[in-house]
């Protein structure tokens, strides 16, 4: 006698995430976005409140180099939201997220970096920068970059020049300059300055990208 046993199993069906969270990391003093690093830089961490406890594994998203963020894969619910990056630690925010939610984090960056680029000779561009040591931290590195694409930071560049630091790092505001040479005429290049103040996460602060 042949007995055939048939067993059926059902797959749990979960609805896809339909909510989103977007916003910006904003300098508390200047009210401008805090420039960042697109990958392995500032991150937004979302811990969901589920079954009467906070999740252990966060829903992470990177902050763009212009200081904005957008996570479009969020389940509707209650979250504890943190921002980690090159700024003084900020308190987490608890909120309900549903639909298209917007929020900003106001922070005090370790360093404020401004930069400008000028070209007086063919094939040469001089980048000047001012580094404001907002929190009086030890500055470990100041770097000039240029890249052939708009995405430029300490990990993504065509060329990099590191500053030889001296006692000027003890100043509240220090200025530096570097001239990039042998740049092809008629091509578009993108310039940026990054600097590292001592911090546990090894996060860099940046200037805006200059085209």
What are these regions (language model features)?
Residues 65-88:
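A short, solvent-exposed beta-strand micro-motif common in secreted/extracellular proteins
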Residues 30-54, 137-142:
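Short, ordered, surface-exposed loop/turn motifs in non-cytosolic proteins
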Residues 85-110:
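Structured interaction patches on ligand/partner-binding surfaces of diverse proteins
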Residues 49-66:
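Short, acidic Ser/Thr/Gly-rich low-complexity loop/linker segments typical of extracellular
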Residues 180-204:
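Beta-strand-rich modules
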Residues 55-59, 145-182:
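Recognizes extended acidic, P/S/T-rich segments that occur
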Residues 67-69, 101-103, 172-178:
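Short strand-edge motifs at loop-to-beta-strand transitions and within beta-strands
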